[in-house]
Amino acid sequence: MTEAEVGAEDLDTLLDELDYLPGHFHLEMQLNFEPRSPAQLRARDLKLQREGLRQELELVATPQLPAVRHLLGTFSFYLEELGDAREHFLEVARKDPGNLNAWANLAHVYGQLGQEEEEEASAGRLASLMGLEGDPEDAGDPRLRAARCLAEQGYAHGFDVGCASPEERAQVLEAGIALYDKALGYGQQIPIEEKRSWYFTMATLFIRLDGIFLEMGSEEQKRLPAFNRTLALLGEVLKSSDSRHQALAWCYVGMLLERKDTFSTTPMGVHEYGYSGTEPLDCFGKAIEIAKNQPPILNRLAKIFHFLGKQDMAVGTCNMVLAVLTDPELNWQAYCTRAKVRIRAYVHDLERAKVGLGGLPDRNHLACAKADLEEVVKVCPSLRTYLDISQVYYYMGVDAMRELLAVDEAALNQALVFLAKAGELELGDTLPELQLLRGKCLRVQGEDANAAACFKRAVELDDEGSSHTEGFGCLLEALLAQWSQAQLSDGEVGYEVDVWLRHAQGKYPAARLRQELQRVWRGHTEEVLGLARALVAQGRPALVRLLFETMEHEGEDAGGSGKSRVSS
């Protein structure tokens, strides 16, 4: 064995014995695994996640800035923007020469760039900082360096890309929490405010994990220890001098107190940490009080309230922000969140009206949303804003109860204009929701062939495992419309349905696909029966079998339909 081989073997042995390994490119995250989605969709998801992370820079606490920079560099690396990735890691190294992840990540990037000298220098610096080449460098405590390295890695697990199931998302979050726990073991001497920023991120990971467990219907004994620990972590965060952490911690405590009713008995942590007589609304009020006159924090709270379905509270918070800062260029978030609340209110009331649980939705919601979004579009248009205002114009252009009936052609055309502008932006044509909305506009205008092309693209762009089956349902409806108008022959429609049904079966969960077929069946019974006869005649019975299954499930569910409608 040569000297070089012996050295390499010694290094491998040493690395195997380490309790931790710096760098982001070896972490057990979907980001680092072989992509399961096509390159275009993978790039889209990375860029969207990166854009969201950039917005975090406005609010993130100073100790967590290196963690954000490392993630930005990692996303750039996988987007093959190696120069940009290198600059992110170099920026961390310049501000903190003892940052272990910076040197590990730089060594990886330099290796990909073929810059062997820089790669060796970075690896050497890392080895020296870790004490792998004798004594560690004098500057700084090696245990503190290890703690910060692990915390930065734990932070990354909150921004993974490519998880295809709740189980995978849960595993990634659990891994991130474990890294923070290990960081705390190394970091007894970490400054208290920095440690509280770790507690804050851990709490957010725990809350997201609990949400996944709720979604999966996990037993409460599996949720209980983490629930109690999250309350303890938030109790420490409430002692922080950082008003952002204080405000959001109160908001999260309110969220947890609302979730306590999902347990058969009140979790002990509620009593142990002093929340026995505390109402969730009190917590939300304290969060707003702490954040008053601070638009970035208020905007974050408004988004959380919107996500939680507390629409009045979200609008009130947006109004508070706009009273402090009215400029839409500087405060576009408040205008956009308030518009989203209005759109959601309209759609919610519309869905209830369609199943007979309420009157027609108030179209004033659309007028208010339009006014807010137009303020933003004038000064700082974005992909999301274009999509939102297109949705508003779409609903303004169609009859509330008969969506295929146009009531305002000018509004529909304006929706298509904004969708075209969205499509001109970098990621515009990669978003399934853009293709779906464009197809719906065209379908109302009688352009069924063009609409079908949009719906096909929406299905193609959907992630595997997605529950958003509306594009597939709209595609079936467009094909049925073309067939009933003799624009497609029996053979052509049979081929199209067969191909896209198989595509949908490989992409969407079976239960969601069945629900979508039920919706199409109920709305187009005569056409579906005619199509079934045509498919049987052509020797394509797959859809026919699915339709029979749909009818069976619908019959089984009929007795409980009232209950499901109320819950919706």
UniProtKB/Swiss-Prot annotation:
InterPro entries (UniProt xref): TPR-like_helical_dom_sf (IPR011990), TPR_rpt (IPR019734), TTC22 (IPR042342)
SMART domains assigned to the protein according to its UniProt record, in alphabetical order: TPR (SM00028)
Keyword Repeat recorded: yes
Claim: Metal-binding is one of the keywords in the record: no
Per-repeat ranges for TPR: 66-99, 101-133, 155-190, 203-237, 260-294, 296-328, 432-465
Coiled coil location: none
This protein's UniProt keywords: Repeat, TPR repeat
PANTHER family per UniProt: TETRATRICOPEPTIDE REPEAT PROTEIN 22
Listed name of the protein: Tetratricopeptide repeat protein 22
Lineage, broadest ranks: Eukaryota, Metazoa, Chordata, Craniata, Vertebrata
